[in-house]
């Protein structure tokens, strides 16, 4: 079996209940999410802008092709997971990008997740109505 000469950088991103496996390959700036264009995958442009933030910030949007496999969660969670995955893959390409990405707050994983429902309550915190008599 031959070993390929293609250089690829991988990053894993998580947000809420979404998990994104990102692969950066030197190329012309194409982006594929689950084998689809971002415009066909996400419902609006704001989510796509949020996802592409690390590439725009480091001016590498036209340098790498981005291939993403993402599962779980909704559109915002998936975009956040992809953003973190792209950030981690970019740090593998050049370590000096980490300071700029950290200043923009892109390196840290957003650990906020939905709070679980407790028994005796209607939701995580919503209690039944109190009756005095």
UniProtKB/Swiss-Prot annotation:
Keyword Ribosomal protein: yes
Superkingdom of origin: Bacteria
The organism's taxonomic lineage, starting at the top: Bacteria, Bacillati, Mycoplasmatota, Mycoplasmoidales, Mycoplasmoidaceae
Ribosomal protein listed as a keyword: yes
Gene Ontology BP term (one): translation
Coiled coil: none
Entry's family note: Belongs to the universal ribosomal protein uS9 family.
InterPro entries (alphabetical): Ribosomal_Su5_D2-typ_SF (IPR020568), Ribosomal_uS9 (IPR000754), Ribosomal_uS9_bac/plastid (IPR023035), Ribosomal_uS9_CS (IPR020574), Ribsml_uS5_D2-typ_fold_subgr (IPR014721)
SUPFAM superfamilies according to UniProt: Ribosomal protein S5 domain 2-like
Provenance organism: Ureaplasma urealyticum serovar 10 (strain ATCC 33699 / Western)
One term of GO molecular function: structural constituent of ribosome
PANTHER family documented for this protein: RIBOSOMAL PROTEIN S9, SMALL RIBOSOMAL SUBUNIT PROTEIN US9M
Name of the protein in question: Small ribosomal subunit protein uS9
Cellular component terms (Gene Ontology): cytosolic small ribosomal subunit
Annotated keywords: Ribonucleoprotein, Ribosomal protein
């Amino acid at each position: 079996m031959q070993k390929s000469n293609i250089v690829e950088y991988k990053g894993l991103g998580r947000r809420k209940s979404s998990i994104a496996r990102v692969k950066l390959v030197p190329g012309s700036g194409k982006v594929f999410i689950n084998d689809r264009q971002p415009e066909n995958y996400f419902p609006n442009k704001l989510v796509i802008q949020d996802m592409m933030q690390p590439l725009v910030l480091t001016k590498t949007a036209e340098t790498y092709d981005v291939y993403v496999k993402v599962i779980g969660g909704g559109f915002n969670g998936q975009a956040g997971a992809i953003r973190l995955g792209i950030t981690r893959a970019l740090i593998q390409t050049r370590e000096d990008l980490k300071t700029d990405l950290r200043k923009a707050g892109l390196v840290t994983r957003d650990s906020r997740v939905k709070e679980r429902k407790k028994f005796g309550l209607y939701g995580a915190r919503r209690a039944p109505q109190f009756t005095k008599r």
